[in-house]
Amino acid sequence: MSWQAYVDDHLMCDIEGHEGHRLTAAAIVGHDGSVWAQSATFPQFKPEEMNGIMTDFNEPGHLAPTGLHLGGTKYMVIQGEAGAVIRGKKGSGGITIKKTGQALVCGIYEEPVTPGQCNMVVERLGDYLVEQGL
């Protein structure tokens, strides 16, 4: 399966039991910041934004004072899982980023999608990739 198929079929799909509800944007990005696959709506990000995210995975709490920035949008960092998941909130939407052995699985949402639904979609694919050694 191509990386784009993972984005299209597993991240940008309808959320179980909620037809028509889906993430607004998603991507799979290598630890080096290279985009493996993304939705057409995923924001173009700066290398320093991805560097900040990777630093937070290695040094949990790094982004808390400044917020998580992606594509020029600032998200308030909320509880995640140190070294594994970063979650951010902005208004009625937010972001979930799951770190795997080689990549970051990113999902961005707006209402009516809930933070929990975004977490489920992103982390389920991330956990699968971890199980596959990716």
From Swiss-Prot:
Modification after translation: Phosphorylated by MAP kinases.
Chief location bin: cytoplasm
Chain positions with Phosphothreonine modification: T114
Disulfide partners: C13-C118
Residue span of motif Involved in PIP2 interaction: 84-100
Subcellular location: Cytoplasm, Cytoskeleton
GO molecular function, one term: actin monomer binding
Gene Ontology CC annotations of this record: cell cortex; cytoskeleton
SUPFAM superfamilies to which the protein is assigned, alphabetical: Profilin (actin-binding protein)
Alphabetized UniProt keyword annotations: Actin-binding, Allergen, Cytoplasm, Cytoskeleton, Disulfide bond, Phosphoprotein
InterPro entries assigned to the protein according to its UniProt record, in alphabetical order: PFN, PFN_euk, PFN_sf, Profilin_CS
Family note: Belongs to the profilin family.
Misc: The variability of the residues taking part of IgE-binding epitopes might be responsible of the difference in cross-reactivity among olive pollen cultivars, and between distantly related pollen species, leading to a variable range of allergy reactions among atopic patients.
Subunit structure: Occurs in many kinds of cells as a complex with monomeric actin in a 1:1 ratio.
Described function: Binds to actin and affects the structure of the cytoskeleton. At high concentrations, profilin prevents the polymerization of actin, whereas it enhances it at low concentrations.
Name of protein: Profilin-2
